[in-house]
Curated annotation (Swiss-Prot):
Its EC number is 2.3.1.47. Pyridoxal 5'-phosphate binds at residues 110-111, 183, 208-211, 239-242. Catalyzes the decarboxylative condensation of pimeloyl-[acyl-carrier protein] and L-alanine to produce 8-amino-7-oxononanoate (AON), [acyl-carrier protein], and carbon dioxide. It catalyses: 6-carboxyhexanoyl-[ACP] + L-alanine + H(+) = (8S)-8-amino-7-oxononanoate + holo-[ACP] + CO2. The keyword Transferase applies. InterPro entries: Aminotrans_II_pyridoxalP_BS, Aminotransferase_I/II_large, AON_synthase_class-II, AONS_Archaea/Proteobacteria, PyrdxlP-dep_Trfase, PyrdxlP-dep_Trfase_major, PyrdxlP-dep_Trfase_small. The modification N6-(pyridoxal phosphate)lysine is found at residue 242. GO terms for biological process: biotin biosynthetic process. This is Putative 8-amino-7-oxononanoate synthase. It holds the Pfam family Aminotran_1_2. NCBIfam families: bioF (TIGR00858). It comes from the Bacteria. Pathway: Cofactor biosynthesis; biotin biosynthesis.
Length: 399
């Protein structure tokens, strides 16, 4: 036995490095946008979740400054003690209006919203069925709940139905967990099919709208609106930190669900309330989402333009080639790579060409990939330069 109780950490880190899984932070200087300063280099930003370009919007900045001047920098306590402000309820009402639900509840982060909500809804006598590619917060929330957790194959509604048929009757409650837009693939859950299956088996459904809110749907309400399912009873969780350009998370649903979570959700009860600045910025962002649909239109035009470029690349047209463009109906485009080393090589080549596009490697994803995030503020020239840089990087890797 090793004499030092922490000695294993260094060995574990070396294993990570040998597998090409090692990660480190990259410093962005200045305000976020379609172009940013990355470690002193001016680059095109295809790495951000700021899909509508609102994180640097002057209206959000002014709202945050005004709230800070009026209410201070911190909320100073939990919502049930000293942390509640009328601004929080204004944001919750705005989220409920956007999501077309009866009420909403704001959390300090989207990750915390998932952990806390899942733990409040199910326990050791219950069953969770989870898409195998769900976000870490859904997976971790399921694990911590104490419920029996079974994964179903990615987007496989037949597989989900089979698990329900086999296992549902053995448990008190059943909760289905799924992202609506999958963050590392860009594909979208077939929500009408899922709801039809789960309704037949008396199962609750929790959807994570993190990458759909502000992006999908006629008014930007997300994938639930996109699929025409706003009249269905389900639990919608999301974040304020992506298309809405702020920080925090939310749960939207029925009034009784939200009232229950205020009383039974540890991730909301026992944590400090969202800061006034973040709350005000998110509230301003929702107003922009509802009043400026052209941002979503431009975003989807950018996505379609880049998709068309990538689909025409010879390196991505071979059925069994080393590189593959994954199917996507969102602002996220992923190019699958054969291995972590190749992914790093392509990512470095893009960075040298002035393109910031992250490579995602195991264990975050099952296979290495280049993950591209499009923004409404990308110009046609930005998208064209991205296509040229990817063409060159893939050709260099093949040679």
């Amino acid at each position: 036995m090793d004499s030092h109780p922490y000695a294993w950490i260094e060995a574990a880190l070396e294993t990570v490095k040998r597998a090409h899984w090692y990660r480190s932070v990259q410093t962005i200087e200045g305000r976020p946008g379609a172009e940013v300063e990355l470690a002193g280099q001016r680059v095109l930003n295809f790495a951000s979740n700021d899909y509508l370009g609102l994180a640097g919007d002057q209206r959000l900045i002014r709202a945050a400054i005004q709230a800070t001047e009026q209410l201070g920098t911190g909320s100073t306590g939990s919502r049930l003690l000293t942390g509640h402000r009328e601004l929080h309820r204004q944001l919750e009402r705005a989220i409920a209006q956007l999501k077309q639900t009866e009420d909403a509840l704001v959390f300090s982060s989207g990750y915390l919203a998932n952990l806390g909500t899942i733990a409040a809804l199910v326990g050791p006598r219950d069953l969770i069925l989870s898409d195998q590619y769900n976000h870490s917060s859904l997976k971790k929330g399921a694990s911590l709940s104490g419920a029996k957790v079974l994964d179903y194959p990615h987007l496989d509604m037949g597989g989900l139905a089979e698990l329900l048929q086999t296992h549902r009757s053995n448990y008190r409650r059943c909760l289905i967990l799924t992202d609506t837009v999958f963050s590392m693939e860009g594909d979208v859950c077939p929500l009408p099919q899922l709801l039809a299956i789960t309704t037949a088996h008396n199962a609750m459904v929790l959807v994570d709208e993190a990458h759909a809110t502000g992006v999908l749907g006629a008014t930007g309400a997300g994938a639930v609106e996109h699929w025409g399912c706003t009249d269905q009873t389900l639990i919608q969780v999301g974040t304020l930190s992506k298309a809405l350009g702020s920080l925090g998370g939310y749960v939207a649903g029925t009034a009784v669900l939200i009232d229950f979570l205020r009383n039974r959700c540890p991730g909301w009860i026992y944590t400090t309330a969202l800061s006034p600045a973040d709350t005000a910025a998110a509230l301003a962002a929702i107003a922009v989402v509802q009043s400026e649909p052209q941002r979503r239109i431009q975003l989807h035009e950018n996505v379609q333009g880049v998709q068309a470029q990538l689909q025409n690349l010879p390196q991505l047209q071979e059925p069994r080639g080393r590189f593959r463009l994954l199917p996507s109906q969102s602002a996220i485009l992923a190019v699958q790579m054969p291995d972590p080393a190749t992914a790093l090589e392509v990512g470095n080549a893009l960075k040298q060409a002035g393109i910031f596009a992250p490579v995602i490697r195991p264990p975050t994803v099952p296979t290495s990939r280049l993950r591209l995030s499009l923004m409404a503020t990308h110009t046609p020239d930005h998208c064209q330069r991205l296509g040229v840089a990817i063409t060159t990087a893939l050709a260099r890797s093949l040679s």
